[in-house]
Amino acid sequence: MSGFLNAREVAKRMVARERGTIIFTGATASIRGAANFAAFSGAKMALRALAQSMARELGPRGVHIAHVIIDGMIDTEFIRTNFPEGYAKKQQDGILNPDHIADQYWMLHCQPRDAWTHELDLRPWMEKF
């Protein structure tokens, strides 16, 4: 619900200016459910549908809407502390670097309107998909 409410409010100003970017962050669960993840998967799938609908509605009005699927662990203190076996993959570029994710978000924001990306999957090279 927060994705919808926040996007609705900022979209009003962006539509008035005929420009802007809204990026929703999804997960693997945005496209594939898993056992014991029904609530999370349902919410992420709904967020993806919201992004797709808003892209179709607001794109023609100059607002770029993108959905980014983050498919893998992100190098954070939480991961380092709670998932040391996952963090060990860092040595092989096996977890996502937050700065590299930010670079991709900035790239989406800077895209020219004639070549907008509406969905982007970010995953380490060794992550299964």
What are these language model-derived features?
Residues 1-5, 17-20:
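Conserved internal alpha-helix in NAD(P)-dependent oxidoreductase domains
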Residues 7-8, 52:
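A short, exposed helix-loop element centered on a Lys and neighboring polar residues
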Residues 9-10, 112:
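A structural motif corresponding to the C-terminal end of an alpha-helix
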Residues 14-17, 59:
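Helix-to-beta-strand junctions that scaffold the AdoMet/dcAdoMet cofactor pocket
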Residues 21-46, 51-52, 56-60, 74:
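Catalytic loop of short-chain dehydrogenase/reductase
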Residues 36, 63, 67-82:
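Short beta-loop-alpha junction of Rossmann-like oxidoreductase domains
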Residues 60-69, 87-129:
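C-terminal helical subdomain
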